[in-house]
């Protein structure tokens, strides 16, 4: 495939155009008075969003050189979103500001490598300053404020998420699902719940709610299908002697085995319920082991040389209460040893750290929460599918941001933290002239987020920046109410992690672009005229 190459000024100019196109599209969404962007979809209704990373991911430019610049900045937005969950638009605005300032300096003859070193020093100094300004999140109100800001000033989402976070704690899992009603609701699932219901409605013990409720029950976890009741008879006899109910979790229970269990249940011989094992493949094995550890039993795997007919009561798990409906099974207060459960949780944590796939990480986090004792579910409600998609994305962003706030503390929002931090740092005397240029570029770029927030709110960005600089501490410009006030008190706050990540990622990509001097792209193919249809070319 032939390539096309651009050098020096031509290359930098092409990158600048690409960066500018992407940044201009994303910038309009910044701040409480930011505008929406409408994205065309190849099928279905267009998506209306105010989420920076969603907009950035959609942008592909026709010119291959411009597209390179745009996709590098797109990387800033998605990396910031992955790590901190919010701050994607701030990162894009910062990247453009650093790149544009740096480009002027490079054209004027500054050495890009020296300048890069100065930029990195400034980022490191400002990050240190941000950490020293950070305040720990102590109460639910502060969490609600963080979530409200991250969900584009939706107070309902903020309060819901803060409530959920306070229930599940720092390590707990909160899942975001599409709800069935117009309201966004939150539900709390205690104990370990998995999405498998009873195999026969004849197991039901409470006919009004159509649930099986087993108190102080035994739990059998078996990896294979159970079709023949003969293998189970010795175990069932021992359970009947104890007078306790039994939950069977297996790949499947069918045929004669299921029929015998149902008949004994209907006759009142003993209370029993059978459900399929959760998950698929290797994940199913891992989840079965989780259930066994939680209930203090042993997962019966034939690969380990344990046969079903030789299973004894000590190998069964125990649980204080088990509730099974047609879709879900919930095990409450399993009888597992806390040391074993803790060891299993630590093992899953290590797997999460090593995991490279987002999907695997999400599933591992779910398993972790189920072992740790509960999951909070947020069911997002909306009137239309388009609104549902947009709202769900906002809830997920807000969730990430709230987690980040609990982790590293909070700062005043509205672009003020960066402005304050940049005003407090000073370049060391040891820097060379070119490094000093890079250092000062970052200090000037720290004004960009506040300038953009003000301009989206219909104010003059330069004037607002100067007014805020003259103030002290957490005081700044609240674009939502158009008032200068203490931002932390009025709930305009950003997680430290979000601000720090946005600055770091923006500087990283901007310096990469500034130190690049040639672009190599594939030559676009010229497509010839389309052939005639029909039998035109027969004559």
Swiss-Prot record:
List, in alphabetical order, the Gene Ontology terms for molecular function in this entry.
ATP binding; ATP-dependent protein folding chaperone; isomerase activity; unfolded protein binding
| Gene Ontology cellular component terms for the protein in this record | GroEL-GroES complex
Record GO biological process: chaperone cofactor-dependent protein refolding; protein refolding; response to heat
Gene3D superfamilies documented for this protein: GroEL, GroEL-like equatorial domain, TCP-1-like chaperonin intermediate domain
Record EC number = 5.6.1.7
Q: Which residues does the annotation say bind ATP?
A: 29-32, 50, 86-90, 414, 478-480, 494
Pfam families linked:
Cpn60_TCP1 (PF00118)
User: What function does this protein fulfil?
Assistant: Together with its co-chaperonin GroES, plays an essential role in assisting protein folding. The GroEL-GroES system forms a nano-cage that allows encapsulation of the non-native substrate proteins and provides a physical environment optimized to promote and accelerate protein folding.
Q: Which NCBIfam families match?
A: GroEL (TIGR02348), PRK00013.1 (NF000592), PRK12849.1 (NF009487), PRK12850.1 (NF009488), PRK12851.1 (NF009489)
The annotated subunit structure for this chain is:
Forms a cylinder of 14 subunits composed of two heptameric rings stacked back-to-back. Interacts with the co-chaperonin GroES.
> Belongs to which family?
Belongs to the chaperonin (HSP60) family.
Tell me what this protein is called.
Chaperonin GroEL 3
Look up and give the organism this protein is from. Rhodopirellula baltica (strain DSM 10527 / NCIMB 13988 / SH1)
């Amino acid at each position: 495939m032939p390539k096309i190459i651009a050098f020096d000024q031509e290359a930098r100019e092409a990158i600048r155009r690409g960066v500018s196109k992407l940044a201009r599209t994303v910038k309009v969404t910044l701040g409480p008075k930011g505008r929406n962007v409408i994205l065309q979809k190849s099928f279905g209704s267009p998506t209306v969003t105010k989420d920076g990373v969603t907009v950035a991911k959609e942008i592909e430019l026709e010119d291959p050189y411009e597209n390179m610049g745009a996709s590098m900045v797109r990387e800033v937005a998605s990396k910031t979103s992955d790590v901190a969950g919010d701050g994607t638009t701030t990162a894009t605005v910062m990247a453009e500001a650093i790149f544009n300032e740096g480009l002027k300096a490079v054209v004027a003859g500054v050495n890009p490598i020296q300048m890069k070193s100065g930029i990195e020093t400034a980022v490191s100094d400002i990050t240190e300053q941000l950490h020293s300004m950070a305040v720990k999140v102590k109460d639910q109100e502060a969490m609600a404020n963080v979530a409200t800001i991250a969900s584009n000033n939706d107070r309902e989402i903020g309060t819901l998420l803060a409530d959920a976070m306070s229930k599940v704690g720092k390590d707990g899992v909160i899942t975001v699902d599409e709800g069935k009603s117009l309201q966004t609701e939150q539900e709390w699932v205690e104990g370990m719940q998995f999405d498998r219901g009873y195999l026969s409605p004849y197991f039901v013990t409470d006919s009004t709610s159509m649930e099986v409720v087993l108190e102080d029950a035994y739990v059998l976890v078996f990896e294979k299908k159970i079709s023949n009741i003969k293998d189970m008879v010795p175990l069932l006899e021992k359970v009947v002697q104890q007078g306790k109910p039994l939950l069977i979790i297996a790949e499947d229970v069918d045929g004669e085995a299921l029929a015998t269990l149902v008949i004994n249940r209907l006759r009142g011989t003993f209370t029993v319920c059978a459900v399929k094992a959760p998950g698929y493949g290797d994940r199913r094995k891992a989840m079965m082991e989780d259930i066994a550890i939680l209930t203090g039993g042993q997962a019966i795997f034939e690969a380990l040389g344990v046969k079903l007919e030789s299973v004894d009561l000590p190998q069964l798990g125990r649980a204080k209460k088990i509730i099974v409906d047609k879709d879900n099974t919930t095990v409450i207060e399993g009888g597992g040893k806390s040391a074993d459960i803790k060891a299993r949780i630590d093992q899953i944590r290590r797997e999460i750290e090593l995991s490279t796939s987002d999907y695997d990480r999400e599933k591992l986090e779910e398993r972790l929460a189920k072992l740790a004792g509960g999951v909070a579910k947020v069911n997002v409600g909306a009137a239309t599918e388009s609104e549902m998609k947009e709202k769900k994305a906002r809830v997920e962003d807000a969730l990430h941001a709230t987690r980040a706030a609990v982790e590293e503390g909070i700062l005043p929002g509205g672009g003020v933290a960066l402005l304050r931090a940049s005003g407090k740092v000073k370049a060391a005397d040891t820097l060379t002239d070119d490094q000093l240029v890079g250092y000062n570029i970052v200090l000037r770029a720290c004004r960009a987020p506040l300038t953009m927030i003000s301009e989206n709110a219909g104010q003059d960005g330069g004037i607002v920046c100067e007014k805020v600089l003259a103030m002290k501490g957490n005081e700044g410009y609240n674009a939502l109410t158009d008032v200068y006030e203490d931002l932390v008190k009025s709930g305009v706050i950003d997680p430290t992690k979000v601000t720090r990540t946005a600055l770091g990622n923006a500087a990283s990509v901007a310096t990469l672009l500034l130190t690049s001097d040639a672009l190599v792209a594939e030559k676009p193919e010229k497509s010839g005229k389309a052939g005639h249809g029909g039998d035109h070319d027969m004559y």
